[in-house]
Regions:
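Charged, amphipathic alpha-helical segments and their flanking helix caps
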Residues: 1-114
Length: 114
Protein backbone atom coordinates (compact mmCIF):
# COMPACT_ATOMS: atom_id res chain seq x y z
CA UNK A 1 0.00 0.00 0.00
CA UNK A 2 2.94 2.37 0.59
CA UNK A 3 4.10 2.09 -3.02
CA UNK A 4 0.57 2.60 -4.35
CA UNK A 5 0.10 5.68 -2.18
CA UNK A 6 3.46 7.10 -3.19
CA UNK A 7 2.69 6.59 -6.88
CA UNK A 8 -0.70 8.29 -6.42
CA UNK A 9 0.99 11.33 -4.85
CA UNK A 10 3.55 11.47 -7.66
CA UNK A 11 0.85 11.18 -10.33
CA UNK A 12 -1.20 13.94 -8.69
CA UNK A 13 1.83 16.26 -8.54
CA UNK A 14 2.80 15.54 -12.15
CA UNK A 15 -0.74 16.13 -13.35
CA UNK A 16 -1.02 19.42 -11.47
CA UNK A 17 2.39 20.89 -12.34
CA UNK A 18 2.56 19.52 -15.88
CA UNK A 19 5.93 20.34 -17.45
CA UNK A 20 6.81 23.13 -14.97
CA UNK A 21 9.01 20.75 -12.96
CA UNK A 22 12.05 18.94 -14.32
CA UNK A 23 11.50 15.96 -12.03
CA UNK A 24 8.80 14.49 -9.79
CA UNK A 25 9.94 11.19 -8.35
CA UNK A 26 10.62 9.01 -5.33
CA UNK A 27 13.49 10.17 -3.16
CA UNK A 28 16.32 7.68 -3.77
CA UNK A 29 16.79 6.97 -0.06
CA UNK A 30 20.19 8.44 0.68
CA UNK A 31 21.87 11.84 0.73
CA UNK A 32 25.12 11.00 -1.03
CA UNK A 33 27.01 13.64 -2.99
CA UNK A 34 25.81 12.05 -6.22
CA UNK A 35 22.15 12.16 -5.15
CA UNK A 36 22.42 15.78 -4.03
CA UNK A 37 24.16 16.77 -7.26
CA UNK A 38 21.48 15.05 -9.34
CA UNK A 39 18.68 16.70 -7.37
CA UNK A 40 20.20 20.16 -7.77
CA UNK A 41 20.86 19.68 -11.49
CA UNK A 42 17.24 18.64 -12.03
CA UNK A 43 15.67 21.64 -10.27
CA UNK A 44 12.90 22.54 -10.00
CA UNK A 45 11.76 19.18 -8.68
CA UNK A 46 9.76 17.41 -5.99
CA UNK A 47 10.84 14.13 -4.40
CA UNK A 48 8.48 12.02 -2.29
CA UNK A 49 9.50 9.79 0.63
CA UNK A 50 7.62 7.75 3.21
CA UNK A 51 9.10 8.36 6.67
CA UNK A 52 7.19 5.67 8.52
CA UNK A 53 3.98 5.32 10.48
CA UNK A 54 2.69 5.47 14.01
CA UNK A 55 -0.42 4.42 15.86
CA UNK A 56 -3.46 6.45 14.92
CA UNK A 57 -6.23 7.79 17.13
CA UNK A 58 -8.54 5.00 15.98
CA UNK A 59 -7.69 1.49 17.10
CA UNK A 60 -6.21 -0.64 14.31
CA UNK A 61 -5.32 2.36 12.15
CA UNK A 62 -1.92 3.78 11.35
CA UNK A 63 -0.93 7.34 10.60
CA UNK A 64 1.72 7.50 7.88
CA UNK A 65 4.23 10.31 7.67
CA UNK A 66 5.27 11.55 4.24
CA UNK A 67 7.79 14.17 3.22
CA UNK A 68 7.94 16.12 -0.02
CA UNK A 69 11.38 17.53 -0.77
CA UNK A 70 11.05 20.61 -2.97
CA UNK A 71 14.18 21.57 -4.90
CA UNK A 72 14.39 24.89 -6.70
CA UNK A 73 16.92 27.11 -8.35
CA UNK A 74 15.53 30.29 -6.75
CA UNK A 75 13.45 31.20 -3.72
CA UNK A 76 10.90 33.51 -5.28
CA UNK A 77 10.11 32.99 -8.95
CA UNK A 78 9.33 36.37 -10.39
CA UNK A 79 9.11 35.09 -13.94
CA UNK A 80 5.90 33.28 -14.89
CA UNK A 81 7.85 30.53 -16.62
CA UNK A 82 10.18 29.81 -13.66
CA UNK A 83 8.47 29.02 -10.36
CA UNK A 84 10.52 29.56 -7.22
CA UNK A 85 10.46 27.51 -4.04
CA UNK A 86 7.78 29.70 -2.46
CA UNK A 87 5.42 29.20 -5.40
CA UNK A 88 6.09 25.45 -5.67
CA UNK A 89 5.52 24.85 -1.94
CA UNK A 90 2.31 26.91 -1.89
CA UNK A 91 0.91 25.08 -4.90
CA UNK A 92 2.03 21.67 -3.60
CA UNK A 93 0.18 22.22 -0.32
CA UNK A 94 -2.90 23.39 -2.21
CA UNK A 95 -3.02 20.32 -4.47
CA UNK A 96 -2.20 17.67 -1.83
CA UNK A 97 -3.85 18.93 1.36
CA UNK A 98 -6.95 16.76 1.75
CA UNK A 99 -6.04 14.53 -1.21
CA UNK A 100 -6.85 10.85 -0.70
CA UNK A 101 -6.24 7.70 -2.66
CA UNK A 102 -8.77 4.87 -2.95
CA UNK A 103 -7.32 3.08 0.07
CA UNK A 104 -6.09 5.88 2.31
CA UNK A 105 -7.40 8.66 4.48
CA UNK A 106 -6.87 12.23 3.33
CA UNK A 107 -3.37 13.69 3.40
CA UNK A 108 -3.08 16.71 5.69
CA UNK A 109 -0.36 19.31 5.77
CA UNK A 110 1.52 19.35 9.06
CA UNK A 111 4.52 21.67 8.65
CA UNK A 112 7.06 23.11 6.27
CA UNK A 113 10.72 23.48 7.17
CA UNK A 114 13.63 24.99 5.35
Amino acid sequence: MITETEQAYIARIREYFGNELVSVDTHPGDWSDGVLRSMLINAPAIYVAWLGAGEGRTRGRLVSHWVFYVIGDMLNGREASRPGLYQIVARLIAVLNGFRTEKTSPLYFEKAVN
